[in-house]
């Protein structure tokens, strides 16, 4: 936008810009409230958006007043701007192809997620590429030491904390002591940025990330001092001020190569000690953060440093210093893994990688061998592939990944039912290439890869032709940080978190302006067109500030409602939820909770209104659809209940209760029995073959529709799945009697085993010879029908009553080895183990039964009874 290097006579616009830049790089990463919003980093997001908007507003006013402005033109601009434009086009393409009901949701998708690219990424890049590299690394260690003192002063906050009496957002955020500290910090930041150069901005980033790392290390050691009450749920976790250890770890990955260059080029012992200390703290936090993808990213960044000849010669020239740092780094990393004489979470986290083997690197995995970190990612990548296949050219559209993920994950779940508990709502799949493929299709991922290929080639050319020096080595280190971040985001989502994404795109802008040809500027003067653009930028900045204010107030009110609800003040909670939803309709959690409170009070109409308002902004939220169906049912609106249940089951295919409810509604009024709904119910009996009520309900629907043959086939399928279901057998007999046809073989088979089951249940009333005959008959049945698991289960029951628990257990384990979803076998084996006082194993099989049949009454009651003992 303009060269931001401080001129000889500083203008008011430059002063304002320096203040905003100091706040942007210092306040944003460190401002952290856990008692304002449920998502602790929501305040950070708002502050960053507002500060970026203010910087652009300042530049726009400067342009309108001074009548001229200079843009720095770089080799990267065309590729990046084309990528941004194409992303916007993908959103328009998606909107035009989706039904009207989804378009409001897609608008909020753009606000929630699309603006990360359009505001944060683009905004950071454009400002950054207009800040120059001076070519000189100045000593700023005095300021770093002052900032360490400044950070230590925050230890006094719990003792000097003040709070205004009013109960609003401003009063909760305001604190006189904190205001003084922030003012002092921004003033120090302005001193660091006395010359606004990339080198000085990098130092300011060093400082803020270092202070965040120190706080995170203290948290990991259990020394929480700022938020002792609100942070209790984060005990021994290094969340720091980024709200997520992965996000701060990603920032560390980007900074490690650069701070290594500062350390190696330090001319004084003081500089060497300070930068060395910062490096060790970064490494310590990286270890405590437990983010393995960041460990990989950092390793790749360091390996890339060794690939550059100038950095290699720098390391070799300062090899004694480098060796000492490496030695200390290994000591720090080893100490973090084995401090206190025992293995820490760091070592345990590293050892978990041994669970990743070629045999389980697949989605076809048994539920007991699911490795969460691995299979959650494999699952999300497979869903991303499904999104891409549904729209291969333009993808789901900018900002629409979360919606598309919710709409497509059922495909993967149905192919791999053992992964049902990995079902998720996410805005990124922990792999940036899959994200770009799903969001932008072939066009989007192609432009994304091309964009960074252009950067990599330019860096290669720069490394080959430029002379040695501070600028060259620092730019190569920044590039290594960018590469490390990209590697990290092959398994992480920090590029979709506001603060690390901002730092990343700032570094990209810095790298682009540094390695490209110098003095390539475009002067723009005021004319009717450019003036209109300037005014539009100013209006857009104002809109961003207002929007972010509404978002923050909404999430504040939503969190207040949650705390009031937890304390039993339901009416006050409802008022806060309603205000939150009115301020920002895309606050889906507030809308869901508002509806839930009304639903608990049996106020079905208000509950339905709240749910429907929430769905208008989040038409992919399966839980809201289900609860809306309950509310509609209570309000007597069966048509809406059916519609919401069908939408829910499209998104969440393993909700047995929803299938049963839908079937009951359709049985009551077969007008709702269209092909789509019948297909859903048929899918339900396929997924839950032991759900007798579901088979019966669907059969009754076919009978009511005079589709007797469909009903017959359904009952036969049901009996094939569970030959012990008496209701299905009776219904099948009744239909065949009505049509005077001969009963099918499955009926005779079911009657045979049901008769045997009655005899087995009356085992103790039979004679010895009768018991022997019963065993012979059961074994004959198993021989005749080896694929029916009810045979071995019944034989296991016989042996258990005969006192041979070992044989009974062997039979049941054999059934479950081949058919782990068998409900009868799971329940029978849990009872057997409980009587053998093997409670832990009994609990396992009860949980297994509930995994395949959620809310099964027998398993739920037994598990609850075991939990009390």
Label each region the model flagged.
Residues 2-3, 8-9, 15-31, 49-60, ...:
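Alpha-helical transmembrane segments of multi-pass inner-membrane proteins
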Residues 224-239, 343-383, 387-389, 398-438:
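Interfacial juxtamembrane loops and adjacent helix segments
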Residues 335-351, 530-568:
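Hydrophobic alpha-helical transmembrane segments in integral membrane proteins
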Residues 554-557, 588-589, 604, 621-623, ...:
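Helix-start (N-cap) detector for alpha-helical repeat units in TPR-like alpha-solenoids
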Residues 566, 600, 634, 668-669, ...:
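Register position in tetratricopeptide repeats
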Residues 579-580, 613-614, 647-648, 683-684, ...:
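Canonical positions in the second alpha-helix
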């Amino acid at each position: 936008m303009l060269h931001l290097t401080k001129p000889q006579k500083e203008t008011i616009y430059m002063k304002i810009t320096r203040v905003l830049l100091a706040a942007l790089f210092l306040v944003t990463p460190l401002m952290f409230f856990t008692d304002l919003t449920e998502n602790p980093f929501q305040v950070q997001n708002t502050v960053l958006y507002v500060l970026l908007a203010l910087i652009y507003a300042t530049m726009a006013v400067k342009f309108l007043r001074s009548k001229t402005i200079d843009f720095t033109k770089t080799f990267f601009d065309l590729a990046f701007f084309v990528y941004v434009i194409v992303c916007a086009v993908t959103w328009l393409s998606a909107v035009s192809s989706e039904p009207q009901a989804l378009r409001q949701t897609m608008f909020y998708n753009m606000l929630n997620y699309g603006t990360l690219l359009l505001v944060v990424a683009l905004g950071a890049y454009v400002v950054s590429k207009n800040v120059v590299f001076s070519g000189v690394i100045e000593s700023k260690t005095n300021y770093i030491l002052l900032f360490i003192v400044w950070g230590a002063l925050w230890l006094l906050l719990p003792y000097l904390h003040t709070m205004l009496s009013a109960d609003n957002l401003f009063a909760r955020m305001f604190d006189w002591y904190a205001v003084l500290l922030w003012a002092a910090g921004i003033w120090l930041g302005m001193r660091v940025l006395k010359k606004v150069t990339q080198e000085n901005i990098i130092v300011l980033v060093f400082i803020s990330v270092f202070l965040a790392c120190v706080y995170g290390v203290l948290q990991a050691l259990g020394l929480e001092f700022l938020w002792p009450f609100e942070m209790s749920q984060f005990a021994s976790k290094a969340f720091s001020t980024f709200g997520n250890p992965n996000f701060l770890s990603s920032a560390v990955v980007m900074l490690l190569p650069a701070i290594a260059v500062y350390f190696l080029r330090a001319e004084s012992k003081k500089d060497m000690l300070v930068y060395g200390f910062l490096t060790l703290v970064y490494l310590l936090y990286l270890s405590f953060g437990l983010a393995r993808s960041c460990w990989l990213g950092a390793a790749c960044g360091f390996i890339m440093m060794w690939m550059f000849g100038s950095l290699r010669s720098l390391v070799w020239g300062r090899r004694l210093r480098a060796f000492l740092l490496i030695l200390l780094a290994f000591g720090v990393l080893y100490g973090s893994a084995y401090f206190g004489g025992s293995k820490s979470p760091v070592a345990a986290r590293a050892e978990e990688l041994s669970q990743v083997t070629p045999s389980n690197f697949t989605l076809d995995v048994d539920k007991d061998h699911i490795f969460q970190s691995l299979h959650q990612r494999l699952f999300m990548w497979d869903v991303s592939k499904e999104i891409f296949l549904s729209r291969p050219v333009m993808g789901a559209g900018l900002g629409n990944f979360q919606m598309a993920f919710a709409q497509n994950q059922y495909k993967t779940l149905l192919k791999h039912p053992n992964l049902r508990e990995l079902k998720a709502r996410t805005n990124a799949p922990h792999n940036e290439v899959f994200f770009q493929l799903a969001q932008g299709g072939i066009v989007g991922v192609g432009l994304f890869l091309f964009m960074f290929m252009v950067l990599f080639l330019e860096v290669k050319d720069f490394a080959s032709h430029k002379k040695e020096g501070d600028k060259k080595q620092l730019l190569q280190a920044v590039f290594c940080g960018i590469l490390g971040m990209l590697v990290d985001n092959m398994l992480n989502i920090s590029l979709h978190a506001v603060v690390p994404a901002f730092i990343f795109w700032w570094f990209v802008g810095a790298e682009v302006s540094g390695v490209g040809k110098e003095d390539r500027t475009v002067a723009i003067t005021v004319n009717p067109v450019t003036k209109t653009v300037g005014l539009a930028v100013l209006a857009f900045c104002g809109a961003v500030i207002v929007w972010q204010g509404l978002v923050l107030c909404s999430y504040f009110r939503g969190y207040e409602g949650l705390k009031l609800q937890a304390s039993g003040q339901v009416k006050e909670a409802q008022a806060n939820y309603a205000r939150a939803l009115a301020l920002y309709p895309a606050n889906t959690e507030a809308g869901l909770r508002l509806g839930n409170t009304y639903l608990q009070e049996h106020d079905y109409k208000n509950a339905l209104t709240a749910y429907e308002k929430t769905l208008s902004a989040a038409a992919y939220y399966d839980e809201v659809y289900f609860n809306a169906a309950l509310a509609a049912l209570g309000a007597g609106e069966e048509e809406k209940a059916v519609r919401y249940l069908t939408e829910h089951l499209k998104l969440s295919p393993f909700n047995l209760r929803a299938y049963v409810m839908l079937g009951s509604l359709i049985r009551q009024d077969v007008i709702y029995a269209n092909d789509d709904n019948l297909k859903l119910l048929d899918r339900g009996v396929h997924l839950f073959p032991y759900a007798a009520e579901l088979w019966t309900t669907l059969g009754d629907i076919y009978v009511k529709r005079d589709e007797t043959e469909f009903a017959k086939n359904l009952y036969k399928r049901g009996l094939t799945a569970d030959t012990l279901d008496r209701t299905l057998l009776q219904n099948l007999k009744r239909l065949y009697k009505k049509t005077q046809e001969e009963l099918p073989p499955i009926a005779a088979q079911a009657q045979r085993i049901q008769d045997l089951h009655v005899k087995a249940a009356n085992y103790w009333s039979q004679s010895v010879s009768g018991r022997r005959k019963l065993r012979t008959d059961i074994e004959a049945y198993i021989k005749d029908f080896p694929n029916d698991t009810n045979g071995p289960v019944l034989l296991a029951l016989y042996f258990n009553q005969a006192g041979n628990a070992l044989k009974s257990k062997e039979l049941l384990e054999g059934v479950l080895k081949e058919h782990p979803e068998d409900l009868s076998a799971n329940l029978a084996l849990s009872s057997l183990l409980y009587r053998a006082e093997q409670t832990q194993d009994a609990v396992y099989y009860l949980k297994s039964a509930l995994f395949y049949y959620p809310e099964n009454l027998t398993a739920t009651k037994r598990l609850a009874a075991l939990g009390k003992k």
